[in-house]
Amino acid sequence: MKTSVKFETIFPLTTAPLIQCITNEITCESMANALLYIDAKPIMADDPREFPQMFQQTSALVLNLGHLSQEREQSLLAASDYARQVNKLTVVDLVGYGASDIRNEVGEKLVHNQPTVVKGNLSEMRTFCQLVSHGRGVDGSPLDQSEEAIEELIQALRQQTQKFPQTVFLATGIQDVLVSQEQVIVLQNGVPELDCFTGTGDLVGALVAALLGEGNAPMTAAVAAVSYFNLCGEKAKTKSQGLADFRQNTLNQLSLLMKEKDWFEAVKGRVL
């Protein structure tokens, strides 16, 4: 794929960026370990009383809507407001957007603060763009992944960039769609098994934040994070005998794939 992304300079990370994650209990440990596997550093700090000092130390922030509660809502919104005040690099992950009105309201408030990257699966991002969506809970639907549906979403996300010109929008699925005010990229790596263990989208959000914290441009960080994770899944599939084995091998590949000099040559996609 011809793109301005210089994949060969992405890894290894050289600054050990400290990434603050306000996320859910289900995948909290997996996110923290994924960051460690790529030589970033996690801190799972969600108490607003700590934010002034935390924000002085961290390189980027992840705000994840998964497992929403009143207390977590307060933390997410407080962190989002503070991040905007201090121009903190921020990834907003719209987990389960469309599942409830409360979740939608919180998500809209987070996006209103102009985060660096906004992500979700194709169904979540269709709901965000007020398109018909067939997603259920936190899962995307195959009905939202046809070529026609993806093209419709691309056009809707282009409209969103008019309201949020500094934000890169990422929609993940059978194809991964990335839209900024300047360009549209569609990525085509990955394997179906990545939908069969929980938290894959959360891990991608953490990887995006790490690459932002390392100093990469937003589109570069998003493209590289998605591509790297999907290629880890592809490599893991060749070594696995079941889904639990596949999950472990995917996580293993986060620290291993980057050691292959030309790993990025397997990236597939197109620039529109």
Swiss-Prot record:
Swiss-Prot/TrEMBL cofactor(s): Mg(2+)
Gene3D superfamilies according to UniProt: 3.40.1190.20
Entry EC number(s): 2.7.1.50
InterPro entries: Hyethyz_kinase (IPR000417), Ribokinase-like (IPR029056)
CDD domains: THZ_kinase
GO annotation (BP), single: thiamine biosynthetic process
Known pathway: Cofactor biosynthesis; thiamine diphosphate biosynthesis; 4-methyl-5-(2-phosphoethyl)-thiazole from 5-(2-hydroxyethyl)-4-methylthiazole: step 1/1
Keyword Transferase: yes
Role summary: Catalyzes the phosphorylation of the hydroxyl group of 4-methyl-5-beta-hydroxyethylthiazole (THZ).
Protein name, as recorded: Hydroxyethylthiazole kinase
Lineage of the species this protein comes from: Bacteria, Bacillati, Bacillota, Bacilli, Lactobacillales
